[in-house]
């Protein structure tokens, strides 16, 4: 039997985690050839993924939050090989919010998350390809704009380390009453929307910003992206955002949002618009976002809510 070869790409912020260290030791004891690489700066994930492919690794394990997952997935997506010819992808949730992992039902314990590699045949999943004023990006989970993006971008790193997802809520409450709507034009196949919005979600996955379920019905294997637009609500803004922060976005979105499910979406804004791509703020006036079906293969739990079949 061939020895399993896994490569762990670990966000440097979690390098001292004892549970992860124990999990690595456990799987090495089970006969897995498991090497660890730690990211400290931009470009590390790309370099480590290329190295893993050159070494013939079977599985690349991203250990970190949504940004780490996205960085590894983006590097795989940039490759010329098809998904079947690339290493499969696994995730150990170790970020602040872990939005993708939460929605997918991936265990938070490192040893259990590692176990999915052996228990679950990898599924082909979609990724979002984003063109921002001519520059290409990839997004594994969700692109968001408006209020949620401002909260995520402006939340203090120290606060996130101390309070986890609660830090986003505190920052959001502090910003209530200071939210300026964004004017944009959105278009896609048989879809057009123009006006002022306070929140925008384009989902491969379902949630971002520490649990904001902007695209609650999104699937990562349907070849489509889910769009949710929350328009400007004039005098109701503060009350509505307060409800979203206290009880989650679901109730407010059901009544107020415009939704669509599309293979691609174009966004045009007269002023520079910031989209948060899995934690990476990207600013442009013109965006084109496409769902690329089955771009990578990922180990996910049985009954994963993000899979349609």
Curated annotation (Swiss-Prot):
Return the EC number.
2.7.1.-
Which residues span the membrane? none
The cofactor required is:
Mg(2+); Ca(2+)
Residues noted as binding Mg(2+) in the record, renumbered to the chain: 219, 222, 224
Catalytic residues as annotated in Swiss-Prot or TrEMBL: 280 (proton acceptor)
Q: Which UniProt keywords apply?
A: ATP-binding, Cytoplasm, Kinase, Lipid biosynthesis, Lipid metabolism, Magnesium, Metal-binding, Nucleotide-binding, Phospholipid biosynthesis, Phospholipid metabolism, Transferase
Which PROSITE patterns does the entry mention?
A: DAGK
Domain DAGKc stretches: 1-134
What Gene Ontology molecular function terms does this protein carry?
A: ATP binding; lipid kinase activity; magnesium ion binding
- Look up the record and report any one GO term of the cellular component aspect: plasma membrane
UniProt: ATP binding residues = 39, 65-71, 96
List the Gene3D superfamilies hit by this protein, alphabetically: 2.60.200.40, Probable inorganic polyphosphate/atp-NAD kinase, domain 1 (3.40.50.10330)
Pfam families for this protein: DAGK_cat (PF00781), YegS_C (PF19279)
Top EC class, one word = transferase
State the family named in the UniProt similarity comment for this chain. Answer: Belongs to the diacylglycerol/lipid kinase family. YegS lipid kinase subfamily.
Q: Which PANTHER family match?
A: LIPID KINASE YEGS, SPHINGOSINE KINASE
What is the stated purpose of this protein? Probably phosphorylates lipids; the in vivo substrate is unknown.
Please give the name of this protein.
Answer: Probable lipid kinase YegS-like
